[in-house]
Amino acid sequence: DIASSAAALTVSLGNITDARAESMFLAGKAIKRMNNTENGKRASVIDLVGITCSSFRMELAKRFIKECEPAVIKGNGSEIRAIAGTAFHGTGVDVSAADAVSAKNPDSVKSMAHIAGKLAQETGAVVMVTGEVDIIASPENEIAYAIYNGSPNMAKVTGTGCMLTCITGTYLSVTDALTACVLAALTLDCAGEC
């Protein structure tokens, strides 16, 4: 019932149980239904926390993307590589060094932009890859945005990814998915620089 009145929904696989998974799908489907009515645009964000270390989480993520059609798919480099079906090295909730996007390695930025762009085209969702460099790809164009703001200290703070998911959902309630992702990443990254 609550999801039916919400303008946006954020879903995280970070602390998932069977009961939470059921609620996640009920809410995701409610948002999808509401988006297809005269009541205005409604959208969801899925945060792929830990899909590289749990087949249960991976299957939930794939199912949510298929059945609920989120506007935004968010994850670190390992998680996005995994959901895109490309080789990945992550085994936990943190990105592996081999999958990380780094300003010091321009090829990692280009490679991840390509992977995110392909996933965006396949799913119809904006794909947000988080890390030292945030990559945002839209299904509506062939451009991926790379955001180089932030601080190395942000990686030492547990929960910054969850914060970004919530900020993205907040912006998503008032604007399109691409703008919401860019604004959310800039908001958190610039705050991290202070």
Residue ranges of each PLM-predicted region?
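Glycine/small-residue-rich loop that forms an oxyanion/phosphate-binding "nest" at active or ligand-binding sites
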Residues: R20-G75
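Generic detector of short, locally flexible boundary/turn motifs and exposed helical patches
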Residues: I2-A7, N35-K41, G92-V95, V101-S102
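Low-complexity, flexible helical/coil segments
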Residues: L26, G50-F56, E79-T86, C162-G169
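Short, ordered loop/turn segments at secondary-structure junctions
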Residues: G14-I16, V49-I51, G77-E79, E132-V133
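Short beta-strands and strand-loop turn motifs
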Residues: T10-S12, A43-L48, S96-D99
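Conserved phosphate/ATP/ADP-binding segment of small-molecule kinases
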Residues: F56-A144
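Small-residue (G/A/S/T)-rich helix-start motifs and N-terminal tracts that mark the onset
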Residues: D1-L26, K32, H114-C194
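Glycine-rich loops and low-complexity Gly/Arg-rich segments
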Residues: M34-T37, C68-V72, A98-D99, N153-M154, ...
